[in-house]
UniProtKB/Swiss-Prot annotation:
Main location: cytoplasm
PANTHER family from the UniProt entry: HOMOSERINE KINASE, HOMOSERINE/4-DIPHOSPHOCYTIDYL-2-C-METHYL-D-ERYTHRITOL KINASE
Record-linked InterPro entries: GHMP_kinase_C_dom, GHMP_kinase_C_sf, GHMP_kinase_N_dom, GHMP_knse_ATP-bd_CS, Homoserine_kinase, Ribosomal_Su5_D2-typ_SF, Ribsml_uS5_D2-typ_fold_subgr
GO biological process: threonine biosynthetic process
GO cellular component, one term: cytoplasm
Family: Belongs to the GHMP kinase family. Homoserine kinase subfamily.
Protein name per its UniProtKB record: Homoserine kinase
EC number: 2.7.1.39
Xref: NCBIfam families: thrB (TIGR00191)
Amino acid sequence: MRSALATGRRVQVRVPATSANLGPGFDTLGLALALYDDLTVTVRDAPGATVDVRGVGAGEVPTDETNLVVTAIAHTFAAFDQPMPGLDLVAENRIPHGRGLGSSGAAIVSGIMAAQGLLAGTVEIDADALLRLATEMEGHPDNVAPALFGGLTIAWVDGQGPQHKKLAVHRGVSPLVLVPVATMSTALARSLQPESVPHEDAIFNVSRSALLIAALIQSPELLLAATEDRLHQDYRAAAMPETNELVHLLRERGYAAVVSGAGPSLLVLGSDPGQRLTAAELVAERSTNPWTALMLAVDVKGSTVQVVDEGSAPAA
């Protein structure tokens, strides 16, 4: 079927990085961070897709229809029975890949948001559909929810599908992300999880997860106690020993440090902006490997899409 979208129709998308789990909130809590991938998508009059990747991943990720962003666009068009037009994409990537900062979720959300903008006026895609589509591709909503909606998100799945609740983060929370050179496969990290955990550990994490929500939205001084975990971080230590050692070192020194997502990046949640610098200095002093310190804000908007050109003629 021929696409009815006008040739030259162009949308611009911005998607934030995310950090999932935040210590105790395994597969549930996620935080949007002010570090962004930008995407421009233009409808062309020839079939297929081209992708110009700039920044992170340039020369490494696919530049054709197998690119994850293109796959997400196609998934969304198919979900609403819309023919896929030919597309030219320009991806300006800043989110590190394979570091536990939601890069794959950001790519998926970028594609879905681009499809929403391209189809605006033809098909209206609401927030529930955005989350459902993203979760279908990512497999779980803890990263895609904050990428879509910003802020702190609680994500869960019930009989109606994936759900989320967005919460505003206390302005005193100052995230620091420490990014190593090494990468980590999410699949590998998940494979290290045991099939069951002791009952007391489950209770421990339930209490800390509840406390963490309170700490992030109103009581940042509780962040150190609130970010304790017994469900996943130590089980994955063998795959990222230095990350695990640095988490324990930072916590011993009073910093609310956790593994970001599946790792191997570190996330430090401070109530004092000055703590970020001293935490970064401590890691630089103790590690023989380079770590990049990113002093970020919490993103409050989530993903955005804007139609910047309506185009001129129907695409072939």
